C-alpha cells in the first residue's frame, strides 16, 4: 500500500504546471577540497564564477560527504542513502542495488526533463531475486567531451540550449576536473581561463612538503578548478540569456577531497568536508548569508524532491535542508556520519561529526592510510617519501605512513581546522568521546553496518601505487560492509 500511494503521488505531481516547480542544476566536481575555492577563503585559487554564486546565494560551511571516494560518494548522493546501504556500491567502481531508486528517475517520472552530462561513475546492479531492473533515470546521458576538452563540461551549455522548453529540468553536470592526471592543465587555453596559477602562490597544507614539485602539483590542481569555474560561468550566462536563472536552483559540491596525501579517502575534513554552494534567486532568502547548518550528502535527494513537490522515497535516509533556504542557520540535523571502505586498498573506517567534534574509528588500525593509488603515484607523495627516508618528516607529514594507527581519533574542529591534534586519549574530552562513540554504535546497529571478515584486499602496492592484479582480475574483492545484514534493504536513517 505504501508503494502504491507513493506511485499515485508521483502521477499527481507530474500533472503540476512546470512554472510551479524550480529547475535544478546539480554541479559535481571531481576530487576538490572545500577550502580550495575563493569563497571559502583560498586567496590563490581563481574561482570568480563560483564566488559570485556564493555571494548571491547560500554557501554552506558545514557540509559533509558520506564517503571520500568517487563512486561510493556519488551513489550515496543519488540515492540519499549511506554507502553500506547501497549494496556493493559501498566500494569503488561497484553498482548500486537494483531495487534502490535514484532521485533523478523520480523527478523524470514526475515530469522533469533529466540529463546527466559528464562523468557518470554510477551503475545499477543486475536485478536479482526477481527484482525489476532500475528504470532509466535520465532522458539524456552525454559524456560532455569535445576535441581539446575531455573535462565533461564541453556540452553543458548545449544541453541547456537544446532542452525541451515545456518542462522543468534537472541536470546532473559532472566535471572531471580536478581528477588526476590534470587533463585541464595539459589542455590549458589561456584565452578562456586566464594565466596558469603561479606555484609560488599556492597554499601548501601542513601535511604536505613545501617544495617546488609539490607546489607545481598543487598549481596544476588549481588550474583544473579554474577551468571548471569557467564552465560554471558559461552555464549561468546561458540561464540568464534564456531568462531561466531566477527559478533555477544551482547546487555545486564535490564527490571527495583533493587527490593528494591525507585528503581523498580520508575521514578527516580534508577528505570529507565538501564545498557546497547554492544559488536560487526565487527561493533563497537573505542571499549572501552563509549557513552554519550541518548537512550531509544524503540530504541532497530529499531536498530536491521536496522542492519539486515529489514524494521522498521511503528508501532515503537523508533529511531535507530546504528550511535553510529561508533561515540560513535552521537546524536540520545534529549529526553527520561518514564511512571509508575499499578504494584501491583494504579499508574500514567510520566517523561521526557532532557537537563541533569529529570522532573517527579505525577498524583496521594496523595498516597505514596513505590515500588512493593515484595520490600514491603523485609528485607530492614522492616528496613525502624523500623526507621520510631522510628522517625529516614533521608529525603532520608522517601521518600518511603511520602504522599502526590509533584505533580512535577525536578532534575539536573549531580549534583544530587541519585536525592534527588527536584528543582521544585526553581525559578532558573523555565524556565527549564516550558520547560520540555511542552515537556511532547506534548508527552502526540501526543502519545495518558491519565489518566483513573477508574484506576486499589491496589492489595496488601501498608504496608505489602500481597494480597488483591483471586487468579484469577481481579476485581481490571480498564481501562489502553490511552485506551479511542485508543492509541494502534497511531504510532506517540512524541518529540524525
What kind of feature is each model-predicted range?
Residues 2, 6, 17-409, 417-442, ...:
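Formylglycine-dependent sulfatase
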Residues 13-14:
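N-terminal signal peptide c-region/cleavage motif recognized by signal peptidases
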Residues 70-71, 458-461:
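Acidic helix-start/capping segments at beta-turn-to-alpha-helix junctions
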Residues 413:
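Structural signature of FAD isoalloxazine-binding scaffolds in flavoprotein oxidoreductases
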Residues 445-448:
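Short arginine-rich
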Residues 450-459:
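Short, flexible loop/turn segments with low-complexity composition
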Amino acid at each position: 500500500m505504501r508503494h502504491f500511494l507513493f506511485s499515485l503521488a508521483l502521477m499527481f505531481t507530474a500533472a503540476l504546471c512546470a512554472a510551479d516547480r524550480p529547475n535544478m542544476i546539480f554541479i559535481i566536481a571531481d576530487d576538490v577540497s572545500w577550502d580550495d575555492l575563493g569563497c571559502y577563503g583560498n586567496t590563490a585559487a581563481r574561482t570568480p564564477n563560483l564566488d559570485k554564486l556564493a555571494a548571491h546565494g547560500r554557501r554552506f560551511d558545514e557540509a559533509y560527504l558520506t564517503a571520500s571516494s568517487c563512486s561510493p560518494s556519488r551513489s550515496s548522493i543519488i540515492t540519499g542513502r549511506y554507502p553500506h546501504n547501497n549494496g556493493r556500491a559501498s566500494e569503488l567502481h561497484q553498482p548500486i542495488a537494483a531495487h534502490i531508486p535514484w532521485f533523478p528517475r523520480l523527478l523524470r517520472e514526475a515530469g522533469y526533463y533529466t540529463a546527466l552530462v559528464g562523468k557518470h561513475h554510477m551503475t545499477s546492479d543486475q536485478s536479482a531475486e526477481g527484482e525489476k531492473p532500475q528504470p532509466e533515470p535520465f532522458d539524456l546521458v552525454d559524456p560532455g567531451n569535445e576535441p581539446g576538452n575531455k573535462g565533461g563540461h564541453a556540452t553543458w551549455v548545449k544541453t541547456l540550449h537544446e532542452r525541451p522548453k515545456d518542462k522543468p529540468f534537472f541536470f546532473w553536470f559532472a566535471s572531471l576536473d580536478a581528477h588526476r592526471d590534470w587533463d585541464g592543465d595539459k589542455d590549458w587555453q589561456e584565452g578562456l581561463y586566464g594565466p596558469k596559477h603561479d606555484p609560488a602562490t599556492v597554499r601548501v597544507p601542513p601535511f604536505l612538503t613545501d617544495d617546488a614539485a609539490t607546489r607545481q602539483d598543487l598549481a596544476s590542481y588549481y588550474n583544473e578548478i579554474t577551468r571548471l569555474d569557467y564552465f560554471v560561468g558559461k552555464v549561468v550566462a546561458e540561464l540568464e540569456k534564456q531568462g531561466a536563472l531566477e527559478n533555477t536552483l544551482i547546487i555545486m559540491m564535490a564527490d571527495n577531497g583533493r587527490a593528494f596525501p591525507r585528503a581523498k579517502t580520508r575521514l578527516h575534513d580534508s577528505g570529507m568536508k565538501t564545498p557546497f554552494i547554492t544559488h536560487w534567486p526565487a527561493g533563497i532568502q537573505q542571499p549572501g548569508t552563509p549557513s552554519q547548518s550541518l548537512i550531509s550528502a544524503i540530504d541532497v535527494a530529499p531536498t530536491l524532491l521536496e522542492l519539486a513537490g515529489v514524494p521522498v522515497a521511503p528508501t532515503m535516509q537523508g533529511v531535507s535542508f530546504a528550511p535553510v533556504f529561508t533561515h540560513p542557520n535552521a537546524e536540520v540535523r545534529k549529526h553527520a556520519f561518514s564511512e571509508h571502505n575499499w578504494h584501491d586498498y583494504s579499508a574500514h573506517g567510520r566517523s561521526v561529526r557532532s557537537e563541533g567534534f569529529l570522532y573517527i574509528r579505525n577498524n583496521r588500525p594496523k595498516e597505514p592510510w596513505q590515500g588512493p593509488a593515484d595520490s600514491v603515484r603523485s609528485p607530492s607523495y614522492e616528496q613525502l617519501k624523500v623526507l621520510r627516508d631522510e628522517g625529516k618528516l614533521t608529525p603532520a607529514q608522517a601521518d600518511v605512513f603511520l602504522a599502526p594507527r590509533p584505533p580512535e581519533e577525536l578532534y575539536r574542529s573549531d580549534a583544530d581546522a587541519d585536525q592534527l591534534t588527536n584528543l582521544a586519549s585526553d581525559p578532558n574530552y573523555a565524556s565527549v568521546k564516550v558520547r560520540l562513540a555511542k552515537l556511532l554504535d547506534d548508527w552502526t546497529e540501526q543502519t545495518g553496518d558491519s565489518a566483513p571478515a573477508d574484506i576486499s584486499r589491496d589492489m595496488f602496492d601501498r608504496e608505489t601505487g602500481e597494480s597488483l592484479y591483471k586487468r579484469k582480475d577481481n579476485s581481490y574483492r571480498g564481501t562489502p560492509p553490511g552485506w551479511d545484514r542485508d543492509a541494502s534493504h534497511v531504510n532506517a536513517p540512524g541518529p540524525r
